[in-house]
A protein has these predicted regions:
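Active-site anion-handling motifs in enzyme catalytic cores
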Residues: 1-318
Length: 318
């Protein structure tokens, strides 16, 4: 199965490539259309690639930053749509959700998404009424945390699992906890949330604690394509992150992490899945690094099984 996806995920590929119908070259290659965010933050791409692998097919995609959607084309060429994964309930995507709720006549599958409520955002999430309406119509719905369920007052029994990212990493890398404690720390930075003054402070604290420091913005570039960034996580002993997907990727590799939260979704992930600790200020980092509590393992095998189980449910229906 993995060879089927080599062209979109390879050390030789400069950037992840998807058949993005919204770019104008409308060459239909699948019967399912997947809505995703094309921002080069790798947290947007990893769940998409994982979903393709769980369905054993490369899906056509539509970048939800580009709206309105050509519903005439969509209804003519596709039998269902997938929304996900990643933080697609961020307020910047309100226009997409309103368009989806009003105009989509196909079965909807919501998969691996969550709300984003950054501390520095005045508008918090997509309007509740729109989200509830779409979820009520969905054939299947899966979200990544209780925060999303509670914020939108969704069905208490809704499927909640870790991000599909876990499956992509398990399918493409060796996943194993390091047997010997090392000194390599990867700082995964959210450039939009992490204050400018905080970045060098995090580096200083890590180095003064005796660790070897490396850095990623989790943004795919020609110099740092997806696989190269993921190799940095695999090589690290520990991860310090201000990004949710920094914690998710660390968890997927069984690397202990310390998450510094500038958005409650980070704490929501840590609460559900463990595998590290969550702090709310850089001032707490020195103490957190000196305390082995962040090294307590999560229940990775149980959680990835639950991700795969939801994938199997959708695959059987499609």
């Amino acid at each position: 199965m993995l060879s089927k996806f080599a062209k979109i995920f390879s050390a030789r590929s400069s950037l992840t490539k998807l058949n993005d119908i919204s770019k104008g070259e409308k060459v239909v290659k699948s019967k399912t259309l997947q809505f995703y965010s094309a921002n080069r933050n790798i947290g947007n791409y990893l769940p998409v690639l994982a979903i393709h692998q769980m369905l054993n097919q490369e899906l056509d995609t539509w970048n939800i930053h580009k709206s309105p959607i050509d519903w005439g084309f969509v209804h003519k060429n596709y039998t269902q749509v997938i929304v996900g994964g990643a933080g697609l309930l961020h307020s910047v995507f309100e226009k997409f959700w309103v368009d989806l709720e009003k105009n989509c006549n196909l079965p909807i599958i919501i998969w691996g998404i969550g709300v984003c409520l950054p501390d520095n955002d005045q508008v918090k999430g997509v309007p509740k009424q729109v989200v509830q309406s779409v979820f009520a119509r969905a054939k299947f719905a899966n979200i990544r945390d209780e925060l999303t369920r509670d914020f939108y007052e969704l069905d208490p029994g809704i499927s909640i699992t870790a991000c599909p990212t876990l499956v992509h990493i398990a399918n493409n890398f060796t996943v194993a906890a390091k047997q010997v404690s090392g000194k390599k720390v990867l700082h995964s930075s959210h450039v939009d949330l992490e204050p400018t003054s905080t970045t060098p402070e995090i580096k200083r604290i890590i180095q003064e604690a005796g660790f070897n420091y490396s850095f990623t913005e989790n943004i795919e570039t020609q110099k740092y394509p997806l696989k190269k960034i993921l190799n940095m996580y695999q090589d690290a002993d520990y991860v310090i992150t201000t990004r949710l997907h920094g914690a998710i990727i660390a968890y997927a590799f069984k690397r202990p992490y310390i998450a510094i939260s500038f958005d409650p979704k980070v704490a929501a992930f840590n609460k559900l899945y463990g595998g590290g600790v969550c702090i709310t200020s850089v001032n707490e980092l020195k103490e957190a690094l000196s305390n082995d509590s962040f090294k307590a393992p999560g229940e990775y095998e149980k959680e990835i099984k639950r991700v795969r189980d939801f994938g199997a449910l959708v695959a059987d229906w499609i």
